[in-house]
């Protein structure tokens, strides 16, 4: 079983913020596929999807970004998901808006959601799909990430949403992650 984790913050005031790109991606993927709601409550939203006998879970932790690892750990323990079968979708201020980067593993890069996942799982060995949100040096970082973006920026950040959905589909279908990285990192 695969686990796709879209990082973000719960609540309508965060919907169109840079920090909620992970939630937006999960929502986009679900809107294009048949899925089953397993749970939607104050701690997590869990969705199940099946493609050709490949069962996967997509989740949106509802504990706020900085506590995402609590939910991820609970789910991997409950469903016995291996670390190598986890893909975390996360915003990245060091990438230009809309730029994508797949990583096999790595540190948190200052991202508190990733930091909490690493801390709770005790490993950096999970896969990531980073989506560029750029950085505005004129604004405090938390304000920049948590302020709703205009329609133009939102469109630019998610300009590769069809490619992102293909990456998720291929990940679920067990396409080798090195092939995905080689195929998509060089193009995007």
From Swiss-Prot:
The active site is at 19 (proton acceptor). It catalyses: an N-acyl-L-alpha-aminoacyl-tRNA + H2O = an N-acyl-L-amino acid + a tRNA + H(+). TRNA binds at residues 14, 64, 66, 112. The record marks 91 as: Stabilizes the basic form of H active site to accept a proton. The keyword Cell cycle does not apply. Its main location: cytoplasm. PROSITE patterns: PEPT_TRNA_HYDROL_1, PEPT_TRNA_HYDROL_2. Its EC number is 3.1.1.29. It is an enzyme of class 3 (hydrolase). One of its GO terms (molecular function) is tRNA binding. One of its GO terms (biological process) is rescue of stalled ribosome. HAMAP family: Pept_tRNA_hydro_bact (MF_00083). Monomer. Belongs to the PTH family. This is Peptidyl-tRNA hydrolase. It comes from Onion yellows phytoplasma (strain OY-M). The lineage of its organism: Bacteria, Bacillati, Mycoplasmatota, Mollicutes, Acholeplasmatales.
């Amino acid at each position: 079983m695969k686990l796709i984790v879209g990082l973000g913050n719960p609540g309508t005031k965060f919907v169109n913020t840079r920090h909620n790109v992970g939630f937006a991606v999960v929502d986009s993927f679900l809107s294009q596929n048949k899925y089953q709601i397993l749970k939607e409550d104050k701690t997590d939203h869990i969705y199940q999807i099946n493609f050709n006998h490949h069962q996967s879970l997509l989740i949106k932790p509802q504990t706020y970004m900085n506590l995402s690892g609590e939910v991820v750990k609970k789910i991997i323990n409950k469903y016995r998901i291996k670390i190598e079968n986890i893909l975390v979708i996360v915003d990245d201020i060091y990438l230009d808006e809309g730029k994508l980067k797949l990583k096999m593993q790595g540190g948190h890069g200052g991202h508190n959601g990733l930091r909490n996942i690493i801390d709770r799982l005790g490993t950096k060995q999970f896969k990531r799909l980073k989506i560029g949100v750029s950085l505005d040096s004129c604004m405090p970082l938390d304000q920049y990430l948590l302020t709703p973006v205009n329609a133009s920026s939102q469109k630019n950040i998610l300009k590769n949403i069809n490619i992102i959905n293909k990456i998720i589909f291929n990940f679920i279908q067990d396409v080798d992650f090195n092939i995905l990285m080689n195929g998509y990192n060089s193009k995007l």
